[in-house]
Design a protein with these regions (language model features):
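A short hydrophobic beta-strand segment most commonly corresponding to one strand
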Residues: 123-125, 141-158
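Structural motif
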Residues: 46, 70, 80-82, 122, ...
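Short, conserved beta-strand element in jelly-roll/cupin
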Residues: 69-81, 87, 96-107, 151-152
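A short beta-loop-beta micro-motif enriched in histidine and acidic residues
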Residues: 43-44, 60-71, 89-98, 111, ...
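A short, N-terminal "cap"/entry segment at the start of jelly-roll beta-barrel domains
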Residues: 1-51, 63
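Conserved metal-binding segment of the jelly-roll/cupin
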Residues: 117-137
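Conserved short histidine dyad/triad with adjacent acidic residue
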Residues: 49-67, 77-92, 128
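A short secondary-structure junction signal
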Residues: 85-87, 135-138
Length: 158
C-alpha cells in the first residue's frame, strides 16, 4: 500500500513501464467532480478508470476486498472518505475470488488495519492481494463522494 499526495506521483513510476504509467496519470488528471460515472478505458486490458458517486458506508458495514490482476490507484474528486489497508492472513473469506470481476471479499478485522483519510489531492495504491476496505464514511464529513479508481494491470509493475 502507498498513501501519498498526487503532486508526488513521480516517486512511484515503474521504470520498465514509465510511458504507460505517465499516460495513466495524465488520464487521471482529466477527471473532475463533473465527470460521468462509469468505466473509462485508456489502454485496453491495461489501464482503465471507474468513476463513481456514492455515500460512504459506516465502518461496521465495510468489507475487505482484494484483486489479483489489477493494481488500484484510488483518489477522490469531491468529498472525503476513510479507507483501510488490511493484511488478509487470518481473515474470514466471505466471497471467493471471482476472476471475471477480479475481486474477492473478506470480513473486516480492525486489529491490524491501517487507516488512510482520502481527500481531493491525495491517493492510495493497493497492489494485487493487498486487502483494502474503501468507501467508509469519515466522521467529520459523511456526505457524498465522487471518486476515481484507476485500474492498472499488474504487468505494468513487473
Amino acid at each position: 500500500m502507498i498513501c501519498d499526495f498526487l503532486i508526488d506521483w513521480r516517486r512511484y513510476v515503474p521504470h520498465r513501464h514509465a510511458s504507460e504509467f505517465c499516460q495513466a496519470i495524465e488520464f487521471l488528471r482529466k477527471f473532475t467532480p463533473n465527470s460521468e460515472n462509469g468505466k473509462h478505458v485508456l489502454l485496453e486490458n491495461l489501464v482503465y478508470a471507474n468513476v463513481q458517486s456514492y455515500c460512504p458506508r459506516d465502518l461496521a458495514q465495510g468489507v475487505v476486498e482484494y484483486h489479483r490482476e489489477f493494481v488500484d490507484l484510488q483518489t477522490v474528486l469531491a468529498g472525503e472518505e476513510d479507507i483501510y489497508y488490511v493484511p488478509t492472513a487470518g481473515l474470514t473469506e466471505i466471497k471467493a475470488y471471482d476472476a471475471a470481476g477480479d475481486c474477492g471479499l473478506y470480513a473486516f478485522d480492525a486489529k491490524e488495519a491501517v487507516h488512510c483519510h482520502l481527500v481531493p489531492g491525495n491517493f492510495v495504491i493497493f497492489f494485487p492481494e493487498e486487502g483494502h476496505m474503501p468507501c467508509i464514511e469519515h466522521a467529520a464529513n459523511p456526505g457524498e463522494v465522487k471518486k476515481v479508481v484507476l485500474k492498472l494491470h499488474r504487468s505494468l509493475f513487473e
